[in-house]
Amino acid sequence: MSRVQTVLGSITPNLLGRTLTHEHVALDFEHFYKPPPADFENELRQKIKMSTLGYVRLYPYSSRENLRFNDEEALEAVRQDVLLYKKHGGGAIVENSTYGLKPNLEFIVDLAKTTGVHFIAGTGHYIHATQDATHRNLTVEQMTDMYSKDILTGIDVNGRIVKCGFIGEVASVYPVQEFERHALLAAGEIQEVLGCGVSLHPHRVSKAPFEIMRLYLEAGGRANKCVMSHLDRTIFDMDELLEFAKLGCYLQYDLFGTESSYYQLNATVDMISDGQRIENIMKLINEGLVDRLLMSHDIHTKHRLTSYGGHGYHHIHMNILPRMFQRGVTLEQVEQMTVTNPANWLSFNA
């Protein structure tokens, strides 16, 4: 019988409800700090407030406070937003913070207990540059053992055994570093054995998703249990995206709510808007790919939380889905993307 492994235990897939497949509720993102423009340095060093919020929205990675997504203020703001998500019909959140991002399993478990939202935690490794010395020299065999234990045996969290429910996000740069290659191979090997879902994070060039899918597939991983994240900032050409879709993985648009065209982590491209995300998803639906589409926000900075003037985890449900309905997307298609596809991806033995 198929099951989904949440941080509070296994459940049947039909209990998930509408699911956000790529989010963070606690992590350390300070590795990605970018020095601010000299003229705005003072504003971006201050606490986030109305008089500085405009600067933070344009240069989110130049505010260290914005990147501290694990301090007391951030955790309380996250809690309030998860409650809003639940209030507006949210059922589950897939937490993608892995080794290198300092995930907080204790907080995730507490959120699951106190909000009624199902949380699925991931195992795996983020990019090489975020790892400490104890992880950087791990072999493929050591990684497979680690991921397997996190899923099958679980992790002791204050005396409670918490099991991870998927592998991800497994992240890499381009070209893929040796450490990252090990993580991709380990993910493919474990997926083949356990039948779990996998989520991959490509670098910010269009060739990257092709390269990491090749490594994952060569290791034995199944394409139909793999999600390619961040396609809305990676593959902009529809013909190239359709070519990539032939590999058979889930196609995820997971930066909903990011409306600034200036993308600080890759200034050579213009970030697309929510309207363009909807347009692209509709094109993919028309190509017969509705059963492989996923949507999320990838919230990982304070300024995207409602307490800091952001959109929160309920943005897709309250703002995006109504716009999709207005443009002709059917309820059946929305349910496929937000309920059925996440459940199929997260289900073991499916």
Swiss-Prot record:
| Record bears the keyword Transferase | no
Q: Which residues bind a divalent metal cation 1?
A: 22, 24, 169, 298
Q: Name one GO biological process term.
A: catabolic process
Give the enzyme's main class according to its UniProt record, as a single word.
Answer: hydrolase
Give binding positions for a divalent metal cation 2: 169, 201, 230
Q: Where is the signal peptide?
A: none
The note on the cofactor says: Binds 2 divalent metal cations per subunit.
GO terms (molecular function) for this protein are: hydrolase activity, acting on ester bonds; zinc ion binding
Q: What is its EC number?
A: 3.1.-.-
The record's annotation in PROSITE patterns points to: PHOSPHOTRIESTERASE_1 (PS01322), PHOSPHOTRIESTERASE_2 (PS51347)
List the cofactors.
a divalent metal cation
Q: Which UniProt keywords apply?
A: Hydrolase, Metal-binding
Of which family is this protein a member? Belongs to the metallo-dependent hydrolases superfamily. Phosphotriesterase family.
Q: What name has this protein been given in UniProt? A: Phosphotriesterase-related protein
